[in-house]
Amino acid sequence: MTLILGIDPGSRITGYGVVRQTARGCEYVASGCIRTGSGELHERLQIVFRGVSEIIAQHGPVTMGIERVFMARNADSALKLGQARGAAIVAAAEAGLEIAEYSATQVKQAVAGTGGANKEQVMMMVMHLLKLTQKPQIDASDALAIALCHAHTRSSLVPHGLTTARRRGGRLRL
């Protein structure tokens, strides 16, 4: 049994989802959103860092999946997103979690079967896979999808004797 944290980073709303990976699949543990309000950027980043740290302390995940930054039309938005992502990564690294990064296409492919799935399709698959009876908030749904993608990736590596794949540089850590 492994607890996995999924993070959908944002400078105003950061979604989180925690799932328990068992031999039979994944089970829902918790999800929600860290809302930072409209303060100064450094204050919002601190809220993201503290929020992720609290979630880790409360639920005790051992690994985290996080969405990669995509280049939006607005470079300023992409930079802020990257900074929020960095705050979440530092919180996880401070807690000793293994960290993996996934593109939005990888997450959609793993959860919905197609990299072109829309948010509603991803949410419906998250609800189906985790047997949820109520729709989660959209950012929480995305975070749960990231956690499911990470669980799927981890389980496909474990049978080959690999515990963590380092995508950068093509090196594997056994």
Swiss-Prot record:
Name of this protein: Crossover junction endodeoxyribonuclease RuvC
Coiled coil region boundaries: none
List locations, semicolon-separated. Cytoplasm
- Species this chain originates from: Pseudomonas putida (strain ATCC 47054 / DSM 6125 / CFBP 8728 / NCIMB 11950 / KT2440)
Q: Which UniProt keywords apply?
A: Cytoplasm, DNA damage, DNA recombination, DNA repair, DNA-binding, Endonuclease, Hydrolase, Magnesium, Metal-binding, Nuclease
A biological process (GO) annotation for this entry?
A: DNA recombination
Q: What family does the entry list?
A: Belongs to the RuvC family.
Record bears the keyword Nucleus: no
Primary site of residence: cytoplasm
Q: PROSITE patterns attached here?
A: RUVC
Provide the organism lineage as a comma list. Bacteria, Pseudomonadati, Pseudomonadota, Gammaproteobacteria, Pseudomonadales
Q: How does it assemble?
A: Homodimer which binds Holliday junction (HJ) DNA. The HJ becomes 2-fold symmetrical on binding to RuvC with unstacked arms; it has a different conformation from HJ DNA in complex with RuvA. In the full resolvosome a probable DNA-RuvA(4)-RuvB(12)-RuvC(2) complex forms which resolves the HJ.
Q: What is its EC number?
A: 3.1.21.10
